[in-house]
Amino acid sequence: MDYKNLVAERIKENTELEVDLIEKLIEIPPKKDMGDYAFPCFQLAKTFRKAPNLIAEELKEKINKEGFEKVVTVGPYLNFFVDKTVLIKDVLEKVLNEKEKYGSSKVGEGKNVVVEYSSPNIAKPFHIGHLFTTAIGNALYKILSFEGYNCIGINHLGDWGTQFGKLISAYRRWVDEEALEKDAIGELLRIYVKFHEEAEKNPELEKEARLNFKKLEDGSEEETELWNRFKDLSLKEFNKVYDMLGIKFDSLAGESFYSDKMDAVVQEIDDKGLLVDSNGAKVVMLDDYNMPPCMIKKSDGATIYATRDLAAAMYRKKTYDFHKCIYVVGTPQALHFKQVFTTLKLMGHDWADDCKHVGFGLVKLANKKLSTRNGDVVFLEDLLNQSVEETLKIINEKNPNLKDKEGTAKKLGIGAVVFTYLKNNRERDIVFDWKEILSFDGETGPYVEYSYARGKSILRKAGELTGEADYSKLSSKEEFELAKLLGGFNDAIMNAIDKLEPAMVTRYVIEVAKAFNKFYNAHGILNAEDNDVKLARVKLVEATCQVIKNALNLLGIDVVEEM
């Protein structure tokens, strides 16, 4: 039984409000002794022409209370206490019947959602900052897919621009082929940095680089061959990280893909009378929207990011007819996307309202213990590998006889890092601290994983239990609170979709783990007072494990069965 929906239906019977609106207004009371659901009656004051607290009293008398233990008023709120036995039975049966599908729905059926995320620059380091966009985008992709949306995951690679002209010049002068084979990104970064050092002494290098890129734009075989090599070498390195994270994309259409589509976009902007000359550059004026102009072409005629993003948005709408197009890109780019979306609207594309920028913060290291390859950039692959190594040390200390220690350390170590990136509001900065991230206490990935493994250990020891569970035996506060929390999984997912915030699921699974451990510490499970209680509690453990697994999977984190 969906109690939130039941509350909404009962209120609808006595008001003119629609169920969808009522569900959005329903709150969870701040204290557990105040009830399970609360409806604020302020919304009805105009319709009923009475004070909200009087409306609450009247509704309490009229409302059908079947399925609830009681309905009470708390000032202007109408508070509902659910029938605990019915709720526990309904939730556990639903979880155990639906298993890996529990929490899913068909709410997004028939709707396409484009998610652009990760998007590293070719020939540049895949550093720890990139995990923000990669982890958030992957989680949103999984969450939306779980609710029936048809998602298209796009890795919008930074694979075009004048920097490739510079890289071609640098490659021809200074590349060490042996180093390139061993550490492609490191070597490409080295020669790119050297180019900038040398260009300060010799400005002719910049001219040469521009000529190289012009040749690349014109399809020169030699330049194109080098560009493809840089791209292939980079993707080979990037794929090591994607494989570690278990991430795949539906499209790798990066900036270069739109290079032949931008002239048509510029022409359309011009045809709409939006293109203005500004010191030789071509811009769209956005003064009426309190924004600086959106630059479309630089004074030398080159297109920039905005032009490419306009071309990409138009191509995606035409190709995928998206319901939403989500851009998981750092918060500093917020103005850029506002300019792009506003320009699309001015061009007459009202679907620009369906384009959403999902920003995120920065990542900082609490200390400098993580070595860097070039002194200032922390490569993501190195971070993940170090996390696995540190986790293996902890496992060797805590459980040296564990089977498949390396496999467990890999899942735990990588999962701990991803969990940290997804734990708090995405716009908050992360301070990366190994001690906290890999701790088995507190609000961490290992704590949630340990809770799951503890539950699975109980289930293995319990073996096959026969008979039908009598859920009325689950009469304690801890059992009810855990079951009620399990019943709220879909609400957490829908909140994550509404706010485009995976942390709603991360915070939820932390609360499930906490509630499970409270229950575990308060009650005997395998040594329960009788077999009926034992069976009911084992079923509660089984349902909890299922929900934790489902939630972690949505976050892109593998569970470990044993620790």
Swiss-Prot record:
BP GO terms, sorted:
arginyl-tRNA aminoacylation
Do you know which CDD domains this protein is assigned to?
Answer: Anticodon_Ia_Arg, ArgRS_core
Its Enzyme Commission number(s) read 6.1.1.19
Keywords assigned by UniProt?
A: Aminoacyl-tRNA synthetase, ATP-binding, Cytoplasm, Ligase, Nucleotide-binding, Protein biosynthesis
Pfam families for this protein: Arg_tRNA_synt_N, DALR_1, tRNA-synt_1d
State the superkingdom: Bacteria
Q: Name one GO cellular component term.
A: cytoplasm
UniProt cross-references to Gene3D superfamilies, sorted A to Z: Arginyl tRNA synthetase N-terminal domain, HUPs, Isoleucyl-tRNA Synthetase, Domain 1
Looking at the keywords, is Oxidoreductase present? Answer: no
Motif 'HIGH' region positions after renumbering to this chain: 120-130
The UniProt GO MF terms for this protein read: arginine-tRNA ligase activity; ATP binding
Reaction catalysis annotation: tRNA(Arg) + L-arginine + ATP = L-arginyl-tRNA(Arg) + AMP + diphosphate
Localization, per the record, is: Cytoplasm
Q: Which family does it belong to?
A: Belongs to the class-I aminoacyl-tRNA synthetase family.
Q: How does it assemble?
A: Monomer.
Name the chain's protein.
Answer: Arginine--tRNA ligase
User: Whose protein is this, by species?
Assistant: Clostridium botulinum (strain Loch Maree / Type A3)
